[in-house]
A protein has these predicted regions:
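Gly/Pro/Ser/Thr-rich low-complexity, intrinsically disordered segments predominantly at protein N-termini
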Residues: 1-182
């Protein structure tokens, strides 16, 4: 696919449905981004990220958790974080009846896990999340054994594998050891 190829929401849904082994996103300029399936370790860490978040939120009833196949539409971009949280009350009442539509909002909290992706590309994606309304983002960098925390105020903090991250005021009370997703 040429790097200049732009797609509409309907085209992106159609392309995704015809290619279930691939994941697609759309950049803010409308260009299509194709991501191959992850390897075993990356898929495992994505599943763990969602499971840790879901397990904690199920007992606190603060909102909904979404996995890496969910498309979030913020401005013109459509992105699919490895795990995401949307606070209660922010989703449209009928959100769970709209299977063939992207969620038309930015999550409150996202988790991304670096696989073989260039770290600069993922860091730019994290900044884009924040620019589009995400309040807190965690980027786990397995290659360098660290994590980065992105906040709505634009600050970014780097943490070592030995640190424990917390959901701050976005997912209040949620904590996770960095090493658990490395």
């Amino acid at each position: 696919v040429p790097s200049w190829w732009t797609v509409t929401d309907k085209e992106l849904i159609l392309i995704s449905s015809k290619n279930p082994d691939l994941q697609f996103e759309r950049n803010a300029d409308g260009t299509l981004v194709i991501m191959p399936p992850t390897g075993g370790i990356s898929g495992n860490r994505e599943a763990k990220a969602g499971a840790y978040l879901l397990s904690w939120l199920e007992s606190h009833d603060l909102g909904e958790v979404f996995g890496p196949s969910t498309g979030f539409k913020a401005n013109t971009a459509i992105k699919s974080p490895d795990a995401a949280f949307v606070a209660r009350g922010r989703l449209a009442e009928d959100w769970d009846e709209q299977e063939d539509r992207f969620l038309n909002l930015a999550p409150d909290f996202v988790i991304e896990i670096r696989s073989k992706t260039d770290i600069e590309t993922l860091q730019a994606k994290m900044r884009e999340y924040i620019d589009n309304g995400v309040r807190l983002g965690w980027l786990f960098d397995r290659q360098n054994q660290q994590a980065w925390v992105y906040r709505a105020d634009g600050s970014v903090t780097q943490y070592p594998a030995t640190a424990v991250l917390n959901g701050e005021d976005v997912v209040l009370g949620f904590t996770l050891a960095v090493r658990s997703l490395l």
